[in-house]
């Protein structure tokens, strides 16, 4: 069954999410290797962003305690705290949750499209490292399909808002950004988003990054309203400008009290990184806004999106039902093939017995075989037609299980591609 363990801004604070975050691929790979050793876990992937850690799996049976215990040990967190905080979803609930996440209905900022790219990256990583197979492939691709339908059929993402854009919106409330210079620390995806929103607001941006080439490349994409420098010069910039947006992947805070000088004007620091980049004392001239603080601005946008969200949830509900109908349909064809194969095997076996006992001449063997197969074909025609008519219907799962029991089809199904998936798991260019 499908299984999801979720830690988000809804059930955890930023301090706990910092500890749980998978800021590098080595840590993510280590965790997936650990949990994939469990006999009940067949496939798994991890989505890790500043607002959520989602463990999505296909399992034989529920195993939340093992997964949470493994996460607790790796991240040095109390297991009982995680079990208390975790939201756990099973089967249809897990698929509905995954579709909601992909469609940005579960995001801090409903309607932002950044999560789709993050899910894509998480899926690609799991496929590349052999943690993900056909079960999660079906689920993730269906999640992308659902997200596309939500975007196309509602207005929820027509004006996309990310955490970075919310930070810039908050800055615009505090001052007119036109012609001001803002410092963006980090040249990754979140830093680039912040820079784009700042430029759109009329500001000029300075990109600071450890990798100077990456900062240069970003500035080339941003255009003439941007410049760049090395992160080594951070202190100089911190004590020269008013607005700072920090979005690095550093494991510890990079902006601390030791770098801050007292100045006679106000400075605003927006920490949009997890783990946090900023650990400084606030005073009358220094204000710090962390990821969780931005929810205040987010609430202003939620009212405008509630109606679209209701429409989107309707789509997600229908797509969830459609997904499980699709899985049932996948199971029907192997049942039909297995029954026909079983009939052929019994016919051939009885034919050989008849030949051995002299009930049938060898010269008549092929004619007898054709006759027997025609009889079975005619006999199985109506059951086959009726089974095909069950495709997409609610009772198909009950009938499939009954057919497996009545015809003892367990062994016959082993040689059939029961879990056929139309997505190419070998070619990374096609799995998206």
UniProtKB/Swiss-Prot annotation:
NADP(+) binds at residues 186-191. Substrate binds at residues 49-52, 107, 112-114, 118. The keyword Oxidoreductase applies. GO terms for biological process: protoporphyrinogen IX biosynthetic process from glutamate. It is an enzyme of class 1 (oxidoreductase). Keywords: NADP, Oxidoreductase, Porphyrin biosynthesis. The active site is at 50 (nucleophile). It catalyses: (S)-4-amino-5-oxopentanoate + tRNA(Glu) + NADP(+) = L-glutamyl-tRNA(Glu) + NADPH + H(+). Homodimer. Belongs to the glutamyl-tRNA reductase family. Possesses an unusual extended V-shaped dimeric structure with each monomer consisting of three distinct domains arranged along a curved 'spinal' alpha-helix. The N-terminal catalytic domain specifically recognizes the glutamate moiety of the substrate. The second domain is the NADPH-binding domain, and the third C-terminal domain is responsible for dimerization. During catalysis, the active site Cys acts as a nucleophile attacking the alpha-carbonyl group of tRNA-bound glutamate with the formation of a thioester intermediate between enzyme and glutamate, and the concomitant release of tRNA(Glu). The thioester intermediate is finally reduced by direct hydride transfer from NADPH, to form the product GSA. This is Glutamyl-tRNA reductase.
